[in-house]
Amino acid sequence: MGKIKIKKNDVWIDMTPMSDVMVLLLTFFMLSVNFTKNEVVKVITPGSTTKAKVSSSAVLDITIDPEGRVLMSTDKTVTMEKALDQMLKEREASLTPDQKKEIIVFNQIGIPVKSMPDFLSKSHEDQVKLMKTTGIPTDSLQNREDKMSEFQLWVKAMKNGYKEWYNDLSDAEKTEVSATKLEINIKADKETPYSAVKLVIAELQDINESRYKLVTQAKKLEE
C-alpha cells in the first residue's frame, strides 16, 4: 500500500513588527546615550565617590591638561559661533566665514585669538600639535583697564553667546530647553598640578563666576 504524501506548505513570517521594534529601540538608545565629544585634547579625570551628575547639555567645558594648559569647548555650535564673533571683536582680529567654520569644527578652543589666522594656514597635523602645546592665555592682557585675561574674555563670551541664543527663542521653544544659562564644568587631568586648577578657579571668581562643577570619574568605595 502506497504512503500518502503530505504536501508541505512554505512557512512565511511577517517580520515587519520586529523591524518596527528594532527601529524603536535604536532610536531610544540614540536619544538617551551621551556621545563623547570629539575633542583634540582629552584628559583622564581623577576618581571620586560623589554621586552628583554633570549636565550633558548647555555646558561650558574648561579642560586643563597635565601641563596646566587651558582649553575650552561647548556643546552648542551656535554658542561657539556667537562667542567667536565677540572674541574677534574684543581682540581686534578678523577671520573669513570659512575660517570661522574651520575653528568651530575643532569643537575646542586652545590657542590665542590673534594666532588663529596663522594657525589656519598650517596643515591639520600641525594644527593639532599647536592645540596640544599652546592653550588659552590666562595672563592679564595689556592695554585693558579691566586687566582681564583672554581666558576670562572667552568665558564671558561663551556665557553671553548662550544667553543671546536663549533670548532669541520663542516662549514655546523655551519650554523645550532645560537650562536658561550655560553651566561651567572644570575638567582637569589627574596629573594636572593643583596650582593650575587653583589659577582657573581664581580667574573665574575674578569675573564673578563662582558656580562650577569639578568633573571626576566614578570610583568604588573601598571596603
Language model region names:
Residues 1-4, 13-14, 56, 172-174:
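Short hydrophobic/aromatic-rich motifs at helix boundaries and adjacent loops
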